[in-house]
């Protein structure tokens, strides 16, 4: 072999050795976002959304003893959590898809008008399970706008906006599992217009939360499951400052964070807790919630 040939071969070998660490680094960067962020990997996450009350009206209030004395005291409190806008409906869309999808009011829209990415479609595409439990929904998959008899309003159920979220994943609340091990990877629970504190008192909503999800919350602590409780918006009196509390396995009891978070950050965190590597809408540039995990 000539001297020139040996030099060329040495250069190729050096290039390969140099490229290998870079390739390995690329594999690390592409690892699931939940691992990169140091988040836990729960089997299930349930999100409950209440209505139209500010952080100041809820946190520390004697009208919400369960939320404060059990969930907040035993979980993680986001002291600087904010909604995105007013009124209700665009906030739900922001929380579910990282974008209001052009909806800026509470008017009834054509069901499944959007094919944009969202939490439900991302979970399904990744082979994971998704579901919603909608109190007052007349029947599974119903796209009715309202039902006065059951105090139901579709404006609080954003999954109906998306053609890539099957209607049969929108369950009635009576279908909420009694065997919690069968829960979807991520699910939303939406109370009706009274129990979500929209038309009725904070105490009404707090009692509903305890009576309907208290047993699950207790179970979650020892079964790799997490409950998140948040609000769509405030009452327009406190700059959209809202209560957001996490509770269950992996959540440090009595923890809190003063970092500024909003619905996009909550969505990003839900995606990453589920081990997704995709992020819908503004969640792509949002931050994972930190400071409350064990």
What label would you give each PLM region?
Residues 2-36:
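Secretory targeting and sorting signals
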Residues 37-294:
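Flexible, surface-exposed loop/gating regions in the mature catalytic domains
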């Amino acid at each position: 072999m000539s001297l020139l040939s040996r030099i060329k071969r040495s250069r190729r070998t050096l290039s390969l050795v140099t490229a290998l660490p870079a390739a390995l680094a690329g594999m690390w960067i592409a690892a699931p976002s939940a691992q990169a962020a140091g988040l836990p990997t729960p089997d299930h996450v349930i999100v409950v959304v209440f209505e139209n009350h500010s952080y100041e009206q809820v946190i520390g209030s004697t009208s919400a003893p369960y939320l404060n004395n059990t969930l907040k005291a035993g979980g993680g409190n986001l002291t600087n959590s904010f909604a995105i806008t007013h009124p209700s409906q665009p906030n739900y869309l922001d929380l579910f898809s990282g974008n209001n999808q052009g909806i800026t009011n509470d008017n009834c829209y054509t069901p499944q008008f959007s094919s944009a990415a969202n939490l439900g479609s991302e979970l399904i595409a990744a082979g994971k399970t998704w579901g919603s439990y909608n109190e007052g929904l007349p029947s599974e998959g119903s796209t009715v706008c309202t039902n006065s008899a059951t105090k139901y309003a579709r404006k609080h159920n954003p999954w109906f906006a998306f053609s890539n979220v099957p209607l049969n994943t929108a369950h009635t609340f009576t279908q909420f599992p009694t065997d919690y091990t069968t829960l979807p990877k991520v699910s939303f629970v939406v109370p009706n217009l009274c129990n979500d504190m929209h038309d009725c008192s904070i105490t009404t909503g707090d009692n509903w939360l305890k009576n309907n999800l208290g047993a699950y919350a207790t179970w979650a602590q020892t079964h790799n499951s997490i409950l998140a409780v948040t609000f769509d918006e405030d009452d327009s009196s406190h700059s959209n400052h809202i209560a957001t509390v996490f509770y269950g396995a992996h959540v440090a009891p009595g923890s809190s964070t003063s970092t500024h978070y909003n619905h996009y950050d909550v969505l990003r965190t839900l995606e990453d807790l589920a081990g997704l590597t995709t992020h819908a809408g503004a969640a792509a540039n949002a931050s994972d919630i930190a400071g409350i995990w064990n």
